[in-house]
Amino acid sequence: DVEPAMAGPKRPQDRVDLSAMKSHWHESLTAPIGHSGHGVEVANSGHQIEVIGSDGRTYNLKHGDIVISAITSCTNTSNPSVMLGAGILARNAVEKGLKVAPWSKPSLAPGSRVVTEYYDAAGLTESLNELGFHNVGYGCTTCIGNSGPLEPEIDAAIEEGNLVVCSVISGNRNFEGRVHQKVKANYLASPPLVVAYAIAGTLDIDFDVDPIGVDSEGQSVMLADIWPTDAEIHEVMAKAITPEMFTDRYSTVMSEPQWDAIPSTPSALYPWASESTYVRLPSFFEGIQPDPTPISTIDGAHVLLKLGDCVTTDHISPAGAFPHSGPAGQ
């Protein structure tokens, strides 16, 4: 049987069945610090900090709360079925009166403008916007750490309580410090599950038995009540997507007026500008010849980094923003 699953909290290869996510989270939170553990003492696992958000709402932020929920461009947004599934789920949630948790920052970064076209054609854009999944651009965003800042009140609460807060994204990498420097647990999920967890606002939920929220009439709503069926998705796909959407968009993909307007000088090789502070000729290539000299014996060298397994370039030098209080920020 094929079961829905996620991956995390620190490596993309660490698969977790959706049905086991709640118990997995409880174990992960208090497990020793490692690939899946966060080292929180059991006595502190229920710790929470009161937050007064920028909109005036008051809530308690705690371990396991999802502060970033992002449908990202890299992995799933070339798959219309899951993208439309996320849109239909959003529509069904809005019809029930459900909202995204006030501490969760949702975003939508389609991998193609075609996604925007078929969302508009299917009438799903408004529902996604209603939940806060606004289109923030076409390209690499949250997965590489370009999610933008959290609300200052949330940022301060995380710092004060040393909270292990989470992100749920539809990206392909979730290494520590990559998505956001304050978010210690990051899980990869399908676009519909990103929407679902944004509404739930926490990993401390079993969707099979726990309500995802309360509707406008005060009745509990289960995820199954709003989850789109395959028939719903296929019906919307048949009505909203045409081959012309792809051919029209991709026929001009190599031409962009703003890019074409940048002045340039034709040349066989890139004309490095010595005064540039942004793009510079690496010193490694100075004096290089077609036939390099053989590597000589290395004596008296020191090891710069001696690392264990599963240490990536993202651990050494995260691609996203770095905190003002860190060494790089100073």
Regions found by a protein language model. Name each.
Residues V2-G123, A261-Q330:
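Non-catalytic terminal/interface segments that mediate subunit docking, oligomerization
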Residues D17, N60, V67-T72, K105-L108, ...:
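Structured core elements
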Residues A20-S23, E27, A31, E130, ...:
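Charged/polar, solvent-exposed surface patches and flexible loops
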Residues V82-L84, A90-K105, V115, H134-P257:
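Mobile "lid/hinge" segments at catalytic clefts and subdomain interfaces of large enzymes
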Residues L124-S147, F322-Q330:
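Active-site rim segments in enzyme catalytic domains, especially the processed small/beta chain
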Residues E126-E130, S255, P263:
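Short, charge-rich amphipathic segments
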